[in-house]
Swiss-Prot record:
Coiled-coil ranges per UniProt: none
Membrane topology designation: Multi-pass membrane protein
Solcar repeats: 13-94, 102-195, 196-295
Protein's job: Mitochondrial transporter that mediates uptake of thiamine pyrophosphate (ThPP) into mitochondria.
Domain of life of the native organism: Eukaryota
TM spans (from-to): 19-36, 75-91, 109-128, 163-187, 203-219, 270-287
Claim: Ion transport is one of the keywords in the record: no
GO molecular function term, any single one: thiamine pyrophosphate transmembrane transporter activity
Gene designation: TPC1
Entry similarity comment: Belongs to the mitochondrial carrier (TC 2.A.29) family.
Protein name: Mitochondrial thiamine pyrophosphate carrier 1
Keywords tagged on the record: Membrane, Mitochondrion, Mitochondrion inner membrane, Repeat, Transmembrane, Transmembrane helix, Transport
Classification of source organism: Eukaryota, Fungi, Dikarya, Ascomycota, Saccharomycotina
Organism in which the protein naturally occurs: Vanderwaltozyma polyspora (strain ATCC 22028 / DSM 70294 / BCRC 21397 / CBS 2163 / NBRC 10782 / NRRL Y-8283 / UCD 57-17)
Length: 297
């Protein structure tokens, strides 16, 4: 029996129900992958191996350090998830009035627009999450971002030292990354569901997550560097001395310099965890969203 698909071309879904379902789906996904996300970020921005990173984190910061920046990350995922699916539902219907293209292309276009909107709206919390999760000092709950107080302190610190622009370092690269990734995710997801109708949402979501993540991982690495390199606490976030030296504003120029000084492999540091994270993240996101939409509509 074919499952109902609320993301299919022309599917009429109410924006409010999509916002609510997307927010809950985003939070559910975040709760499942928070420790993997922390480890992935540290591998991406550091120079140590996974075993050494995990061992050092637990020994010097405690097991709960795997959830550093979790509050900022949870808020980010709620905003991102609600905007993502709300925008997709609206765009999905609106595109039908503008152009009539094959379902896969339709979903890819809607996904690209969705990616830009959701990335821009949630970006300040993405910056906060990255900085909090990669800070390696042994600190209290209040300063690791697992509480409202710690999150507020970091917001205040960034605003005072870097201004409003501090919350948007790397936003252009992020929008390019997320736009391509989201377009690939929705395009692949709908392509799989159209070609193999019996495929369930979780399986299609997992496959689309792996493909989209692999394509865009180098952009994600560049974005993470842009997010932390202007911080006054950079030395506590990474042991990679090149990050503080590579201060080019252009993502392309920065990419060239990274490859020249550190090699192509650096752009893919942490991709194993990134892919491992993307499978449950995308699968849970789409599965929870689809099932909540069935309940709410």
């Amino acid at each position: 029996m074919r499952e109902e698909d609320h993301l299919r071309k022309g599917e009429k879904s109410h924006v409010f129900e999509s916002l609510v379902s997307g927010a809950i789906a985003g939070l559910a996904a975040r709760s499942a992958i928070a420790p993997l996300d922390t480890l992935k970020l540290r591998l991406q921005l550091g120079t140590d191996t996974l075993p050494h990173t995990l061992k050092s984190l637990i020994r010097h910061e405690g097991l709960l350090a795997l959830w550093k920046g979790n509050l900022a990350g949870s808020i980010m995922y709620i905003i991102y998830g609600s905007v993502q699916f709300g925008t997709y539902s609206y765009t999905n219907a609106a595109l039908l009035k503008v152009c009539d293209v094959p379902p896969t292309i339709h979903s890819t276009l809607a996904g690209a627009i969705t990616g830009m909107a959701s990335s821009l709206c949630s970006y300040p919390f993405d910056v906060l999450r990255t900085r909090l999760a990669t800070t390696t000092t042994t600190t209290t709950t209040a300063t690791t971002g697992r509480s409202g107080r710690g999150l507020y302190q970091h917001i205040e610190r960034i605003y005072i030292r870097e201004g409003l622009g501090g919350f948007f370092h790397g936003v252009a690269t992020s929008m390019a990354n997320v736009t391509v990734s989201t377009a690939a995710m929705f395009g692949t997801y709908e392509g799989i569901r159209a070609r193999w109708p019996e495929t369930n949402a979780g399986t299609a979501g997992a496959i689309s997550g792996v493909i989209s993540r692999t394509i865009t991982f180098p952009l994600d690495t560049i974005r993470r560097r842009l997010q932390i390199r202007t911080s006054s606490e950079l030395g506590q976030m990474t042991n990679n001395g090149y990050i503080g030296k590579h201060m080019q504003r252009s993502a392309i120029t920065l990419c060239v310099q990274i490859v020249r000084d550190e090699g192509v492999k650096v752009l893919f540091r942490g991709i194993g965890l990134g892919l491992l994270k993307s499978v449950p993240n995308t699968a849970i996101n789409l599965w929870v969203y689809e099932n909540l939409m069935r309940v709410l509509t």
